[in-house]
């Protein structure tokens, strides 16, 4: 064979054997998925358990090694439970996450995830090594009788020249043998650097900064089981434990930052001279050790609004479809919620035959708007919070001070619920954001003596205008695009 199928099978029926033969001998299935990452594996299992025949394509089935996709919010854990995949969080040395620890110039505030009811157990997220989690999801896909996992590199989409409908995927194996895989529906889930996005997505990712990451060994965090956000005069720093002995640190470095320029010694010099002094003392020894080992890696921080699918036979999902700044760790939560939504919309009860292109297209149009119930809050919050936490002018810094003061007053349940993917109401985000803005104005007014009231008033107007500029563009994108 041109490619290497890897399958796990339960008790088979004759019809299942026929479907498997169709996948393996004729390279044909109901659904072909490009990318056996977080979303691709979850979708393959979800559709396979509905009785759909699925071919899952992945260029390399080796364990991936990434510095993002390591924090799953409680809302993502809940979506994983709906998919019957929560056990994928076990056996990978994952660490419970109970909320956030925000430090503003070394003044900390804990922000626990809110309980649904006083008698309920507190919601819990998980941190882990990304690769270990993906391998567990791949095991689940391989164990699904209706799914065939094939290690091969997708190179192009097979398209009907008359109707422009996508019919399948052209691939090349490690032995450089070409093959095509056909399905009624082709799913592109090949990540942030998608090679198929450009032809079928109207938007281009916008990169504002990069996260530079190190893995710290046996460091002591100020507040275990909490994601740490460190705020200062510099861009935000994230810390969270991903294993018994490992802690991830991500340092946001905006583009063209002078202290990280080659002239000033590059990123490593920025880490040593700017980042190190701002870290908690308990973290500094492990940070120095990791920095000396030279394990610095980076990922772009991108923003990409979603777009309605218009190509028959194709759906783009995951980071190939929609990205937001990873500051809030919401990417996988959006992905799993998307899988839940799409699974429900494409269920055999609603779409008996995925070859019914007209009905599938109608459901995909519905999917674009239905997914926003979970995705919009996370997308808007990620972009707005990054603007505040990476404040680079006096008005954004005023909003940053107001935001931290808001947390200090104990008004954390709403923000924590939004961050955790537990509250999926944009109206709640709107109320909290402008409550922060109004509190920022009060804090700003108190910083000036009465005789400078005209100056303070002008700065209040500019600060409120800045708040509107921060959030309204993203709210409009989510509402109308």
Swiss-Prot record:
Record's keyword terms, sorted: Endoplasmic reticulum, FAD, Flavoprotein, Glycoprotein, Lipid biosynthesis, Lipid metabolism, Membrane, Microsome, Monooxygenase, Oxidoreductase, Steroid biosynthesis, Steroid metabolism, Sterol biosynthesis, Sterol metabolism, Transmembrane, Transmembrane helix
Chain ranges passing through the membrane: 28-48, 425-445, 452-472
Main subcellular location: endoplasmic reticulum
Pathway: Steroid metabolism; ergosterol biosynthesis
Localization (cell): Endoplasmic reticulum membrane; Microsome membrane
Mode of membrane association: Multi-pass membrane protein
Glycosites: 146
Record-level Gene Ontology MF annotations: flavin adenine dinucleotide binding; squalene monooxygenase activity
EC annotation from Swiss-Prot or TrEMBL: 1.14.14.17
Protein's UniProt keywords contain Flavoprotein: yes
Site (Important for enzyme activity): 100
Gene Ontology terms describing biological process: ergosterol biosynthetic process
Keyword Amino-acid biosynthesis recorded: no
Enzyme class: oxidoreductase
Note: In Aspergillus, the biosynthesis pathway of the sterol precursors leading to the prevalent sterol ergosterol differs from yeast. The ring system of lanosterol in S.cerevisiae is firstly demethylised in three enzymatic steps leading to the intermediate zymosterol and secondly a methyl group is added to zymosterol by the sterol 24-C-methyltransferase to form fecosterol. In Aspergillus, lanosterol is firstly transmethylated by the sterol 24-C-methyltransferase leading to the intermediate eburicol and secondly demethylated in three steps to form fecosterol.
Assigned protein family: Belongs to the squalene monooxygenase family.
Function: Squalene epoxidase; part of the third module of ergosterol biosynthesis pathway that includes the late steps of the pathway. Erg1 catalyzes the epoxidation of squalene into 2,3-epoxysqualene. The third module or late pathway involves the ergosterol synthesis itself through consecutive reactions that mainly occur in the endoplasmic reticulum (ER) membrane. Firstly, the squalene synthase erg9 catalyzes the condensation of 2 farnesyl pyrophosphate moieties to form squalene, which is the precursor of all steroids.
Protein name listed in UniProt: Squalene epoxidase erg1
UniProt organism field: Aspergillus fumigatus (strain ATCC MYA-4609 / CBS 101355 / FGSC A1100 / Af293)
